[in-house]
């Protein structure tokens, strides 16, 4: 396919146009008075959201250079969302500000490499100040305040705080759709591990890219499965029972995997295969944990069990299993409560006996998965459109709250960035274009607060200047228009969110500034429509 190439200023400006189109659509959602964006869907009702990454994903541009610029910023939003669960809009606004200021300096003759180095040093300094200002979360009320800001709803915040309080920070919190109007919390025993499906063809919910089974059998094998002949006897028994099957094994490949996939596609038999978590002895221990939780047995030749001789009573069971590309969650395993309690006590004893910090950490992870359980938040709404939007908000708020528990919180509303920036730049000693690069960050850290003020109908420059000179932790409550102690007022952000947003935005900005050429696919011209054989006459 033919390519088109742009150089120098033309290349950078093309990328910037794409960035600006995307950022302008996303930034209107920032803050308590941010607006929503309506996303058209090819099928079904449109989605109404104020989530930066959801909006960014939907934007596709015609111009090839603008498209590349937009894709780079999508990466900022997606990476921030993956790491912290929130801060996507903040990251996009920061990226736009960094690129705008940076390109202005490049056009004025500054050295892009030195600018990038200056940006990186300034961002590192601001990040250190953010960490130093962090306040650890200790109470349920503080978790609720953080989750409430992300969800934009204090009721949801309280439910999330209750969920995290019950299952602990190591526990699992999932969100499901409810048939009722309200939002309620259900606590269920369960386990999650970091291995997903081995083939995308196992997916049962294409929109969420998940395989979800109710009342499923679980086959746990401590070896590799390649030969379908070994697997067929137990698969036949499961088909006759009318249930679905989750296979957890060292690996499933070759004709065994191919046969399972073909049967799923043809609708003959629903199954999903995942790799067992961990390695070596740790894998054996985790498989035994899963077996005890689900009431099954680990199929291993060392204990005299062969795959071809497996019967249904050796399989585990669970009320529900949810498998994504990265994770498997087992909810309400059919194991015996006494055996589970004994296993939990055994792991606690091992934690007490080990001298290795690494082993202790891994044992605590296993304990959390066995004993912590799963909290399920059931979201309800009047319409399907509202339900999707509400569910998405709750999922973001859960990850936001977990990030807060992990690294602590700082003043929200863009205040922490401005005030951390002020302290960082007083200490930075840079020269030449590196100092110019640091100054780009100095200007950019104001951008989130300015956008929040703009969305609230206030004068951005005046607000930013006033907040910069307020005591540490004090800033604008955009919901009321008052200047308050942000943490005392319950307006906070997890450090992880703010830090990730700044780091990811700076990373992309550095790429923009040091770009000297862009190579893109030449857009294909659509063929002219065929002529009307009737000559346009109405026969």
Curated annotation (Swiss-Prot):
It comes from Clavibacter michiganensis subsp. michiganensis (strain NCPPB 382). Its EC number is 5.6.1.7. The keyword Isomerase applies. The lineage of its organism: Bacteria, Bacillati, Actinomycetota, Actinomycetes, Micrococcales. One of its GO terms (cellular component) is cytoplasm. Belongs to the chaperonin (HSP60) family. The gene is groEL. Together with its co-chaperonin GroES, plays an essential role in assisting protein folding. The GroEL-GroES system forms a nano-cage that allows encapsulation of the non-native substrate proteins and provides a physical environment optimized to promote and accelerate protein folding. This is Chaperonin GroEL. It is found in: Cytoplasm. ATP binds at residues 29-32, 86-90, 413, 477-479, 493. It comes from the Bacteria. Its main location: cytoplasm.
């Amino acid at each position: 396919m033919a390519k088109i190439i742009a150089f120098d200023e033309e290349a950078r400006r093309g990328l910037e146009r794409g960035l600006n189109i995307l950022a302008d659509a996303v930034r209107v959602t920032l803050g308590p008075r941010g607006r929503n964006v309506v996303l058209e869907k090819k099928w079904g009702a449109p989605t109404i959201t104020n989530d930066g990454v959801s909006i960014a994903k939907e934007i596709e541009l015609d111009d090839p250079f603008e498209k590349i610029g937009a894709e780079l910023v999508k990466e900022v939003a997606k990476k921030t969302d993956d790491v912290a669960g929130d801060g996507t809009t903040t990251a996009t606004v920061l990226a736009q500000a960094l690129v705008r200021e940076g390109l202005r300096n490049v056009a004025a003759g500054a050295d892009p490499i030195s600018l990038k180095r200056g940006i990186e040093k300034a961002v590192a300094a601001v990040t250190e100040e953010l960490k130093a200002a962090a306040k650890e979360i200790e109470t349920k009320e503080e978790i609720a305040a953080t989750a409430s800001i992300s969800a934009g709803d204090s009721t949801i915040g309280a439910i999330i705080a209750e969920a995290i309080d019950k299952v602990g920070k190591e526990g699992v919190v999932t969100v499901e759709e409810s048939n009722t109007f309200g939002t309620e919390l259900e606590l269920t025993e369960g386990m999650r591990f970091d291995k997903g499906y081995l083939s995308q063809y196992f997916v049962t919910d294409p929109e969420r890219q998940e395989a979800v089974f109710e009342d499923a059998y679980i086959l746990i094998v401590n070896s590799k499965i390649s030969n379908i002949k070994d697997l067929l006897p137990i698969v036949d028994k499961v088909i006759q029972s009318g249930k679905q099957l989750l296979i957890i094994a060292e690996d499933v490949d070759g004709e065994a995997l191919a046969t399972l996939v073909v049967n799923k596609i043809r609708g003959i038999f629903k199954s999903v295969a995942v790799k067992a978590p961990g390695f070596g002895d740790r894998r054996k221990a985790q498989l035994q944990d899963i077996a005890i939780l689900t009431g099954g047995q680990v199929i291993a030749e060392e204990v005299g069990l062969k795959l071809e001789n497996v019967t249904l009573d050796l399989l585990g069971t669970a009320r529900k299993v949810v498998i994504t590309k990265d994770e498997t969650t087992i909810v309400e395993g059919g194991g015996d409560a006494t055996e589970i309690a004994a296993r939990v006590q055994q792991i606690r004893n091992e934690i007490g006996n080990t001298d290795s910090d690494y082993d202790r950490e891994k044992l605590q992870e296993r304990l959390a998965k066995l004993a912590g359980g799963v909290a399920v938040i059931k979201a309800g709404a009047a319409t399907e459109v509202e339900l999707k939007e509400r569910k998405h908000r709750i999922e973001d708020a859960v990850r936001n709250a977990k990030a807060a528990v992990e690294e602590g919180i700082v003043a929200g509303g863009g205040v922490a960035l401005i005030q951390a920036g002020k302290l960082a730049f007083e200490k930075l000693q840079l020269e030449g274009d590196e100092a110019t690069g640091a100054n780009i960050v100095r200007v950019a850290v104001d951008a989130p607060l300015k956008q929040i003020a703009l969305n609230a109908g206030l004068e951005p420059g005046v607000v930013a200047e006033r907040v910069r000179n307020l005591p540490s932790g004090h800033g604008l409550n955009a919901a009321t228009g008052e200047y308050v102690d942000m943490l005392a007022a319950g307006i906070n952000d997890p450090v992880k969110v703010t830090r990730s947003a700044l780091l990811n935005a700076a990373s992309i900005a550095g790429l923009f500034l040091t770009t000297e050429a862009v190579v893109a696919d030449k857009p294909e011209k659509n063929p002219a429509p065929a002529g009307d054989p009737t000559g346009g006459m109405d026969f």
